Amino acid sequence: APMIVRKRDGGFGYDATDLAAIRRRVGKLKADRIIYVTDVRQSHHFEVLFQVARMAGFLPDDVEAEHVGYGMVLGPDGRPFKTREGGTVSLSDLLDEAETHAAPNIALAAIKYADLSNGLQKDYVFDAERMVQTTGDTGPYLQYAHARVSQILRKAAAEANPNVDPEADLDAMDWGRISVLDEPAEQQLALLLSRFGEIVEVVATDLTPHKLCTYLYELAGAYSVFYEQCPVLRSTGEVRGSRLALCAATRRVLGRGLDL
C-alpha cells in the first residue's frame, strides 16, 4: 500500500508526522533502537513506515526500529470492552473495577500482571475477580509469595538478634551463601534462580514480557514446593544457612522481577 506523505491540498497527515519523528529521534536524539507500542492492527502501517524511512535515509541500517502490537481487552461476552454507554473503557475504569475486589495496590498489580502475562498480541477477557485471586497465575499470587518469603526471613533475623528492627531492609542483611543442595526441591529452586539474568535478557531483546511473567510464576511455584519439603527455620547448621540464602535469593529475584 502507498504511503501518503503530503495530501493534495498541501497538508500533512500521520505518515509525514511519523517520518519526521523518526528523523528527529535518529538525527537529534541519537536513538539506536526505536520501539513503537500500539494496537496490533497498525502493524502494516509501521512495516511500510520503516521501509520508507530507510529508503529516505532517515533510518540507517544500524538503527533498530520495531513495532510491538498489543491485543484488545474484551468484556465477558468476548467483545471489545465498552462502557454501559458504549464508549471506550479507560484504564481508570479498569482500576475502579478491580478495586471493588481488592485493595488498590493489589488491584493495580493484578491488572498489570494480567495484561503482560497474556502475550502482547493476544486479546484477553477482563475478569477482575479472577485477576485478584491469590492462587493461580496472577499478580497477587506473586505478591503473596514475596510476602511469605519475607516473613520467614524476618523471623530468622529476629531469632538471631531479638533487637533487630522489624522494618529493617532484608536485602541489606548478609544471608550467607547457598552451599547445600541435597534435596530435589532445593536444586530446582536454585536452578530457576540461576536463569533470571538469562530470562531478562531474552525479554529485553525479544520484547516479550509474558516470558518474565511465566518465569516468575514458575519460580513462585518452585518456592512453594521448597517451602513444603525443606523446613527452613526448623533446620540447623549449614543446611539452615543455605536454605535461608535460597529464601533471600528468591525474595530478591521475585522483587526485581515484579519491579520490572
Regions found by a protein language model. Name each.
Residues 1-260:
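Non-catalytic interaction-recognition regions
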